[in-house]
Design a protein with these regions (language model features):
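Amphipathic alpha-helical assembly/interaction segments
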Residues: 1-122
């Protein structure tokens, strides 16, 4: 079975891209010991979600697509773990963190749904 999915047409890819952009902005605000390492890990985890969804689409088969979705799901779980480690010094940052957490949970649900129901063949 050949899969011809376009990541730019998948809602999960759009949401993951927005989360990655917001994570980059958040990471720039980190201060204190280990700030760079924490920010870098958060950014790499969010970028991995987007990248693995795109790579899975490019592989061309449903089994490969699903394999990369599992990797993306693991990276989304890592993103949640990194977000739990962030201390929010301001109400604005608290709101930003909550938004990132909520959207990351949404990504996890969307990946699970997409795994169970991959895009149709073209």
């Amino acid at each position: 079975m050949v899969l011809r999915a376009d990541p730019s047409r998948l809602l999960v890819s759009e949401v993951a891209t927005a989360v990655a952009r917001d994570a980059v902005a958040l990471a720039k605000t980190f201060r204190g010991p280990g700030a760079f390492a924490r920010g870098d890990q958060l950014v790499r985890a969010t970028l991995s979600v987007v990248s693995n969804i795109a790579e899975g689409c490019g592989r061309g088969t449903v089994p490969e697509f699903r394999r990369f979705l599992l990797i993306a799901r693991g990276s989304a779980q890592e993103t949640l773990a990194q977000l739990r480690l962030v201390d929010a010094p301001s109400p604005a940052q608290t709101s930003q963190l909550q938004s990132l957490r909520t959207r990351t949970v949404l990504i996890l649900k969307m990946i699970s749904r997409l795994y169970a129901h991959p895009p149709p063949d073209k």
